[in-house]
Amino acid sequence: VSATTPPGGYRNPVPTVDILIELDQAPGTLVFIARRNEPRGWALPGGFVDAGEDVASAAVREAKEETGLDVELHEQFHVYSDPRRDPRKHTLSVVFIARASGEPVAADDAGAVAVCRFDDLAALGGPLVFDHATIVADYLHYRRTGQRPPPRR
């Protein structure tokens, strides 16, 4: 038990998922959402893993809820766990690479949806929230080199 642990219990990170969704009809693009809730801004689709749910099912569910897309998960990309990555609480995110067909439609926590070339994020007109700029940069590096991001502390 540490000084940050509440008396009589543990404070564990909250599991989340984020999804890098590539559209079959728009190569070189990713799907982004404008968050309705704080922190507001552009983000990758994603959210919290529900109790009793595995991370892959959570990714498919969150993608459908926020974009209306039925995604096919291609690979588990990386885990991001910096305690400062989410200003609301300590989260850890399992990030997936997925593909989908069709037009995304904003729903649930998404106030808007955008399809943006991943080498031109400035076209979104605002910054990415959380650590999503790092995730996208790591993904671009992976696409160019085949090298996954190193573990971070």
Residue ranges of model-derived segments:
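Conserved Nudix-box catalytic region and its N-terminal flanking loop in Nudix hydrolases
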Residues: 27-66
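NUDIX/MutT-family hydrolases
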Residues: 40, 95-97, 105-142
